[in-house]
Design a protein with these regions (language model features):
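Small-residue helix-boundary/cleavage micro-motifs
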Residues: 20-23, 32-33, 38
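A general signal for intrinsically disordered, low-complexity N-terminal leader regions
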Residues: 5, 18-21, 45
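N-terminal basic, low-structured, amphipathic or hydrophobic segments
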Residues: 11, 15, 27-33, 41, ...
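Non-transmembrane, aqueous-exposed alpha-helical and coiled segments at domain scale
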Residues: 72-494
Length: 494
């Protein structure tokens, strides 16, 4: 009988159906499930990839074994299921232990992933979080927009912290560049919006993606060719300076920009190459890949609370277009969500609560990793998270910041919205309508006890266990991980 092992490796129990090359070693794991030892999985065995545990193999297999211990063998997309700042950096850091490659697929240095390890705090903006673990390769994909100056600064900061950066970092030659005029235009646009600001980080991300869509952007491949880069940059500086001067802003110096970016390009040259080919060859060798998302579902340019969004696709689909890896090579999607809800910047947040916000700020929590801005806080929003699960095809959820509710009693949970007297179970597309939605709450008993020392589910207070089960039920997705603190060790694997 044919079976699917380890979330995606297809083999046949019929010896005649197996390739003649190599041996097949089947073991029984600690969970009592049979699986193939990863060291013995030949390239020819990875013939059929399934995306979910519940799906049958395309070859028509009718039986399968699912090994939770080896779930990290799968190619995994990790996405934020809220408005960003869900604690993805910590979850990525935990998952990275069982993968070989970590890939960033979209966004720029407007995002910030915070990772705590052995008392040290690391904030990463462009480089994937896997850089903090030895033996992992980090890839910045074609969907990312890169400010070379900012990237070099991040590399220098990490090296000062004795983090090795060399052959473990690859940068796509197709990634677009963020240039000085992008930052200036971003700032000027935000200033002129007055009271109707989007809340941009003013890092030039939106204008850079605008040039990409208009097919006039500069890419890393241009930067690797000094003459080509200088020619293209000169034309763009002339174009943008007309716009900037019309807005009353200082023009960009072509000479300064050209010299600084070419110098940065030479320093980055050893890292730049064809990352699409690298990733496909890695998959052929059975390497495990984690696709690291930036921001969150409701900041997605298509599916977010437009126009209060970022300029890239932050949902699971963006991981494929931003890396060149086809959808059928993805085995699972993990959504990360806080035990409550937060948002930085403008835009609707239906479950926002000022009292909860003030309490969390008083505890030193909820300040943006990139800008340091105070985050707006609200109760857990099951309406939004259910919709995020639908859009991303989330297979399992990781809850973070459960310890943030240790002193809260009672706890509210938003189970639906009310708009013009009508109950809504999905968020409206229009930003104005979403802003006018009233949350419909249910109340859950708090636990009034610390959770940060819990290392397995049974060690959580009974009320905390009930709470996480409840939000799992509301979202319709199983929980795989609970974070009760910033350190790697402060994690409960379910």
């Amino acid at each position: 009988m044919n079976r699917v092992y380890s979330a995606g490796v297809w083999v046949s129990r019929n010896p005649g159906a197996l390739p003649a090359s190599g041996g097949l070693k089947i073991e029984r794991c600690a969970f009592g499930a049979e699986h193939i030892n990863a060291k013995f999985v030949a390239r020819s065995y990875r013939q059929h990839i399934i995306r979910r545990q519940s799906r049958l193999c395309p070859a028509g297999c009718i039986g399968k074994i699912f090994c939770p211990f080896l779930i990290a063998m799968a190619n995994t997309i990790l996405v934020g299921a809220q408005w960003g700042d869900e604690g993805k950096g910590k979850i990525i850091d935990v998952l990275t232990a069982k993968v070989d490659i970590v890939v960033r697929s979209q966004g720029g240095n407007n995002a910030g992933h915070t990772v705590f390890h052995r008392g040290a705090k690391y904030i990463l903006h462009l480089i994937p979080s896997g850089i903090l673990r030895r033996g992992k390769v980090c890839v910045i994909g074609n969907g990312v927009v890169i400010d070379p100056i900012a990237l070099l600064g991040e590399i220098d900061r990490l090296r000062k912290l004795r983090i090795t950066i060399g052959r473990n970092l690859l940068i796509s030659d197709c990634a677009h560049l963020v240039l000085p005029y992008h930052r200036l235009l971003d700032e000027q646009r935000e200033l002129r919006r007055g009271h109707v600001r989007i809340g941009t980080t003013k890092r030039g991300i939106g204008p850079a993606y605008g040039d990409k869509a208009a097919r006039t952007g500069l890419r890393m491949s241009d930067l690797m060719q000094p003459i080509v880069f200088s020619k293209k940059l000169h034309a763009k500086v002339i174009e943008y300076n007309r716009i900037l001067q019309a807005l009353g802003a200082k023009p960009v110096s072509f000479r300064e920009a050209n010299e600084s970016y070419l110098a940065a390009g030479e320093k980055l040259r050893p890292f730049v190459g064809n990352t699409v080919v690298y990733l496909h060859r890695a998959m052929e060798r059975g390497k495990r890949i984690l696709f690291e998302g930036a921001q969150g579902t409701f900041l997605d340019i298509d599916h977010g609370t437009y126009p209060y969004v970022t300029s890239s696709n932050t949902t699971a689909g963006g991981a494929c277009t931003g890396t060149g890896v086809p959808p059928h090579r993805i085995d699972r999607v993990v959504g990360v969500m806080k035990a409550y809800t937060t948002r930085v910047g403008e835009g609707a947040l239906p479950s926002e609560d000022m009292q909860l916000t003030q309490m969390l700020h008083s505890l030193g929590r909820e300040f943006g990793a990139t800008t340091g801005r105070k985050r707006r806080c609200g109760w857990f929003d099951a309406v939004a998270t259910r919709y995020a699960r639908m859009i991303n095809g989330i297979d399992e959820l990781a809850i973070t910041n459960l310890d943030g509710l240790d002193r809260v009693d009672p706890i509210r949970v938003c189970i639906a919205y009310r708009l013009n007297g009508k109950r809504l179970n999905v968020p409206p597309c229009d930003a104005g309508q979403l802003a006018n939605c009233e949350p419909i709450y249910t109340h859950v008993r708090g636990w009034n006890a610390p959770t940060h020392s819990a290392r397995n589910f049974s060690q959580l207070p009974a009320a905390a266990r009930k709470y996480v089960r409840y939000i799992s039920e509301l979202t319709g997705a199983k929980l795989s991980m609970i974070s009760v603190g910033p350190e790697r060790s402060e994690t409960i694997i379910l």
